[in-house]
C-alpha cells in the first residue's frame, strides 16, 4: 500500500529551496525547526532534501 504523495505549498517550497541554497545538507536541529515552522514532518523534510540533491546532481 503506497503512501500518498506530499503536496508542498508555494511558501513551503520557497523555504525549502532557500534552505537548500544555503546548505545542501540539513542538520537535525535545523530540520526540527523547519518542520515545525512549515507544518511538515521531519521525515518529509529529510526526503525532500534527498530528492532535491539528486535533482541537483543530475542538473550538474
UniProtKB/Swiss-Prot annotation:
The cross-references to CDD domains, in alphabetical order and at most eight, read: homeodomain
Query: Which Pfam families does this one have?
Result: Homeodomain
Could you provide one GO biological process annotation from this protein's UniProt record?
A: positive regulation of transcription by RNA polymerase II
Query: What InterPro entries does the record tag this protein with?
Result: HD, HD_metazoa, Homeobox_CS, Homeodomain-like_sf, HTH_motif
Q: Which UniProt keywords apply?
A: Developmental protein, DNA-binding, Homeobox, Nucleus
Taken from the UniProt entry, a GO cellular component term is: nucleus
Q: Does the keyword Membrane apply?
A: no
DNA-binding positions:
1-60
Keyword presence, DNA repair? no
**Localisation per UniProt entry:** Nucleus
* SUPFAM superfamilies per the UniProt record, alphabetical: Homeodomain-like
MF (Gene Ontology):
DNA-binding transcription factor activity, RNA polymerase II-specific; RNA polymerase II cis-regulatory region sequence-specific DNA binding
Q: What is this protein called?
A: Homeobox protein HTR-A2
* Species: Helobdella triserialis
Amino acid at each position: 500500500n503506497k503512501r500518498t504523495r506530499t503536496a508542498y505549498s508555494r511558501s513551503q517550497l520557497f523555504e525549502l529551496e532557500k534552505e537548500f541554497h544555503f546548505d545542501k545538507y540539513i542538520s537535525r536541529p535545523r530540520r526540527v525547526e523547519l518542520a515545525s515552522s512549515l507544518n511538515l514532518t521531519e521525515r518529509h523534510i529529510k526526503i525532500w532534501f534527498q530528492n532535491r540533491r539528486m535533482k541537483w546532481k543530475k542538473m550538474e
